[in-house]
């Protein structure tokens, strides 16, 4: 069927938008590095282009280009243009203020690293070779080995910590009942303890343990109801009333997930005694049936990310149910989404 001229025009416009989709995120990274969100916030009111330009640490010869940078940032919805050349923050860019508790700057900078982009650019080569991941094709080693030997690992920890701050701010106020009545909780793969610290603060009588690889928790200071323990979740998990895994299992293949879940099963008491596993994970939705388009896009993007960087994936409810059953659990309950992820209680 021959395309009409209007269809060709629309297709071409859409084509160029998609081909250059990286430009908006690269521009946002530039804005963060230049301190544009903080400059506008510190101004205390919508900020004129001239004032913004004068406040930034740029070479004077580059001043005329700030207008063009702001134009794409406004078009992408990152900033709002109150009137011509007068800018203000949006809820999105408030997440990029250095002193904000929900600061997610490390996430913007982390996903735009050369190491990450190199992996994405190796995807077509990966489809034609025997490597397990495109990341391995790009770097000659898997993600975990690369992260353990390179500063990239610290950047990854920063990205996960930023995500944990966002999750904890929504998880504890809205889903605090998940932790009520517990005497002890182990946060498996809890990194530097961002979520566990928030839980321990909200539930001072709850003994919280952060369990992660020894090099991750080394030199981290324990408190009265929070301690850090090093180890390997594939070998043994410390005992507790409940085990928390936030966005951990999506990094692993089904067989490895079952192994970790079996370790969790051994570490908790029976359901009658309050034993449970709490997951924060994506439950893939049918994009044609769900009205939350942004959440669906985030889930699909996360799934392809798992393909490129890990031998893993995001999962549907049916796929989760299969893993729980194979690991020896009797049931589960999926709660409403926090963002594009949901709390899941799994019962022995």
Swiss-Prot record:
The active site is at residue 250. The keyword Acetylation applies. It catalyses: S-adenosyl-L-methionine + a 3'-hydroxyflavonoid = S-adenosyl-L-homocysteine + a 3'-methoxyflavonoid; S-adenosyl-L-methionine + a 5'-hydroxy-3'-methoxyflavonoid = S-adenosyl-L-homocysteine + a 3',5'-dimethoxyflavonoid. GO terms for biological process: methylation. InterPro entries: COMT-like, O_MeTrfase_dom, Plant_O-MeTrfase_dimerisation, SAM-dependent_MTases_sf, WH-like_DNA-bd_sf, WH_DNA-bd_sf. The keyword Transferase applies. The modification N-acetylmethionine is found at residue 1. Its EC number is 2.1.1.267. SUPFAM superfamilies: S-adenosyl-L-methionine-dependent methyltransferases, Winged helix' DNA-binding domain. It holds the Pfam family Methyltransf_2. Coiled coil: none annotated. It is an enzyme of class 2 (transferase). S-adenosyl-L-methionine binds at residues 189, 212, 232-233, 246. Keywords: Acetylation, Methyltransferase, S-adenosyl-L-methionine, Transferase. Methylates myricetin and dihydromyricetin at 2 sites. Inactive towards 16-hydroxytabersonine, the phenylpropanoids 5-hydroxyferulate, caffeate and their CoA-esters, flavones and flavanones possessing 2 or 3 B-ring hydroxyl groups. Belongs to the class I-like SAM-binding methyltransferase superfamily. Cation-independent O-methyltransferase family. COMT subfamily. PANTHER family: O-METHYLTRANSFERASE. This is Myricetin O-methyltransferase. It comes from Catharanthus roseus (Madagascar periwinkle).
